Amino acid sequence: GYKFDQPNVKYASLDIGSDLTADINQWGADYYKLPQNSSDYYVFFEADPRVPLLPVLPKKGQKFWYSDRGDLVDSTLTRQIDLSKVKKATLQVDLWYDIETGYDYGYVMVSRDAGKTWTTLRGKHSTTSNPSGNNLGNGYTGKSGGWITDTFDLTPYAGRKILLRFEYVTDDGYNSAGMAVDGVRIPEIGFYDDMESPNSWQANGWVLSGPYVPGRYSLIILDANSPERYVLVDAGADGRAIYKLSAQDPKDEPFLIVAAKSDNTLQKSIYRIQILPKEPGYLTLLAGRASR
């Protein structure tokens, strides 16, 4: 069989009266040694009920299109654009991206043959560098550092209807947050889309999203007084939870594990823990879930 070293878990100690605020990564865990007490006490937990999806808010409005994240992703966002009545055209796009540098790429693409073939458009922030062989042409990789506006010449496609596409492609290794689009403009045809509604976009993997996702948290309390010697307490939709620890035997060591598990994001959230000797009306005030 395999031999593994036991992990060295770091923890902080809490006492009766402790009032702690900390941040936590999604799908991470924090560990706390709880006080050994000869009388009952309460663990109060409160955390952000919503967590940022990305490290940026929408550039305008309340929503943006998001590529989602993951390994072996090939997500597309496509719609028809009518350039049949103009002889020149310019595409302006508001983009944000955090993409694994040199391995994963995002693209702005057009097709003049109803999607049979596609051409990647060159922008100021795109690159043709192809260190891993994964770049399909003019791709976006690395970090944008905030919302950027890139401009593309659509004049070669004027006089016809075309398909416009945003595509995000990843390999089977590490993945970053992905790509977001929050504005598309073609002034010559009066086309302005602030991405607040689907507006004829055909999404395959992309999602029209607000800037936050619901916060999800669980507490695991190592409690020798419980039948299984541990208790799982899920925080409510308000991010709050309450647990009563009964008097402990001096030889027992109660512990608290805080886990954050919000979907589709790795952004940090903030939580607060209070260790109180009695129930001073907080059950009503916090409106959390109580476990006896």
Predicted features along the sequence, with ranges:
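Non-cytosolic beta-sheet module surface loops
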Residues: L83-K85, L95-I99, P156
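Extracellular Ig-like/FN3 beta-sandwich strand-entry sites
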Residues: V86-K88, G159-K161, P250-F255
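Exoplasmic/lumenal beta-rich domain surfaces
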Residues: M109-K161, V207-R240
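Extracellular beta-strand ligand-recognition surfaces/modules
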Residues: L154-Y174
